[in-house]
Amino acid sequence: MKRTDEAHWRALEGMYVGSPINTSYAPQIEVGHETASIEIEVGDHFFHAAGAIHGSVTWKMLDDASFFAASSLIDDVFVLTTSFTSYLTRPVSEGMLRSVGRVVNRNRSQIVAEAVAYDQAGREVGRGNGIFVRSRMELATIPLYAQ
């Protein structure tokens, strides 16, 4: 049975929040048509020795927002990140970290999406863009999506 767009987006959200890697991030996500927004609370468990979040946290937020913006368009198979370029522009050591992704181009074989990350004050702290492609793994076979 084919899901509606709304049902697909909610299933993607459930898949993301329930993924084991996100246990320590406790993210909130909202997926829409060609868009995704993700928020996490910054905690010192994400910090490097200099007292700010490690760049991998911001990178993950950028990739995830771009990935789910791209995934919003594909309702039959899992999407894969084939490349992702990021720019980390400001350290973050407290508050909320939010990333907003959007699709910027699509053709038969790939989707290009970008994301911008913001600190709690609304300042840009990073940006990135990536190329996303369809995999062969059907979404219906992924338990966290199918729930």
Task: Give the location of each predicted region.
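Terminal targeting signals and extreme-terminal segments of soluble enzymes
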Residues: 1-147
